């Protein structure tokens, strides 16, 4: 199930970010991506909160939690079908073909490839949220209350993403990226040394700040560096 979930995330992520870049003026692109991150993360905050309440009320009925989680996904599909208007293609349909072509790859400049390398390095330093939950259990948090850690992370992420996005529109993108990396290092250190649930919560909060500072920013930088007709690629 987790594997299929990651496939779904991979499919939806690129076209979603490309669509935002297509319909947003460049001068407010950081704020737009920040707002998108905030709204997306509200679900990550409300979801664990609801899961925790359901687990407590149903004596850890995991099956019911997953059935309830299906409903927001269905609503999202309906919104895409009936509420999202896709911009016109930049090329005639007859010219649309597989993007994995050598001539297309040559159109990405050095800035873009440096961003790809940076994102790859950041991914190596940022472990899965599953390990964060395991860390919470490791220091003694009961399984019913483990989602609290995700609530802390996503609450901080949601509250910080839009302000960080606005800041990046004011010419602070390089500084914001550096501070985002510093926050990731700090989070990893706190979680590695944590001996109680309070320090795990602090590490999760710092991780949320890192996500708020970098996730939307990386999308903005890619949108700025990539040719308009290859942003989804």
Residue ranges and their predicted role:
Residues 1, 56, 182-195:
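C-terminal ends and interior cores of transmembrane alpha-helices
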Residues 2-41:
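Cytoplasmic helix-loop-helix junction between adjacent transmembrane helices
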Residues 46-66:
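Transmembrane alpha-helix termini and helix-breaking/packing motifs in multi-pass membrane transporters
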Residues 55, 160-172:
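Helix-to-loop junctions at the C-terminal end of transmembrane segments
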Residues 64-81:
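Symmetry-related core transmembrane helices of the 12-TM Major Facilitator Superfamily/SLC fold
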Residues 86-118:
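Juxtamembrane intracellular "pre-TM" segments in multi-pass secondary transporters
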Residues 130-149:
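Short amphipathic helix-loop junctions that connect adjacent transmembrane helices
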Residues 170-181:
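Cytoplasmic membrane-interface "Motif A"-like loop-to-helix N-cap segments
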